[in-house]
Amino acid sequence: IQLLPVNDTTSTHTKADSYPYAAISAFALHPLYISLEAVAGTTHKKLISKIIAHKKELNQAEGVCYEEVMKYKLEALKLLFDVQHKDLFEQADYINFYQQNKSWLQPYAVFSYLRDTYKTADVSQWEDFQFFSQSIIEKLSSPQSKSYPKIAFYYFIQYHLHLQLKQAHEYANKKGIVLKGDIAIGVNKHGVDTWMDPTLYHLDMQAGAPPDDFAIKGQNWGF
């Protein structure tokens, strides 16, 4: 089974983010794919019952209600984060995941927090935070910081996405099915990777393809 890129593309919190190749992170998975029921388990199933009920309405729509799906999933995840994260963050499996992925996870979570705070992924609009530094990351993500809960929220999401994709991969393997992942050859101009080290990218250029029979005007892939 070949998959389109499953990286997070959340840049504007609008339908424009549905383009799967405009990754804001080369590592982070997209919250769109998370199973709320799996995160809630039987213990917290009632907590998100109203949101899950709305899922049936969304599934009956003729097309994908991208913005609405994202809105309701994030609302449900915030409810679950509030009641689960303290215990989860003390578990050995989570601690191992965090330590092994800290190099990208921490900057990604801070980027997501700043994107939400300034309501834009354009880092040039982030005032004192437009230029990346490790000191900024450490300051904002400190457990003593006021911003910590909103940043840790993204740790929580990525950990559960990791568990769920791992489980799906293992299940597919048992059934003799190979998952073939499509990976974009570039990233979103307004993303955590370009924020961390803009010198690695040609930010004044975009990838694409010249005119051919498939696209007579050529293609601009937007990354």
Predicted regions and their residues:
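Active-site-adjacent "gating/activation" loops or surface patches in catalytic cores
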Residues: 192-223
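Acidic/aromatic-lined carbohydrate-recognition and catalytic surfaces
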Residues: 1-198
